[in-house]
């Protein structure tokens, strides 16, 4: 596979691009993460989402600890070529490290942020005490 397609992406100054994970079938936005060239190549090689963890400064195979992997159905690049959209099958039904289906569980309502999505699995059960 020629790496030329990677050169058409508009990477930020840190060599990253935001990647939105969207659930196939429902169209729900599950999470936003970051990718670099290596994580994007690994994603294509494995068929599963591999992101770049800015906090840990390393590749992060989504679900490597929890088992909640994301099978990539398709990838799209936006019109400015600076944001990726990954259509994924969310295995295990949990995309968020908090144990929720998605990471967007705070809704602005009545002048404050309200939690509107339930915890489906206790993070301690998924990760032990690593959270």
UniProtKB/Swiss-Prot annotation:
Q: How would you classify this enzyme at the top EC level?
A: hydrolase
The catalysed reaction is: 1-(5-phospho-beta-D-ribosyl)-5'-AMP + H2O = 1-(5-phospho-beta-D-ribosyl)-5-[(5-phospho-beta-D-ribosylamino)methylideneamino]imidazole-4-carboxamide
Localization of this protein: Cytoplasm
**Subunit structure of this chain's protein:** Homodimer.
Name one process (GO BP) from the record.
L-histidine biosynthetic process
Q: Which NCBIfam families match?
A: PRK00051.1 (NF000768)
Q: Which family does it belong to?
A: Belongs to the PRA-CH family.
Organism of origin is: Thioalkalivibrio sulfidiphilus (strain HL-EbGR7)
Sequence positions that bind Mg(2+): 78, 80, 82
What Pfam families does the database record attribute to this sequence?
PRA-CH
Query: What's the encoding gene here?
Result: hisI
Q: Quote the protein name from its UniProt record.
A: Phosphoribosyl-AMP cyclohydrolase
Q: Which residues bind Zn(2+)?
A: 79, 96, 103
What's the EC number here?
3.5.4.19
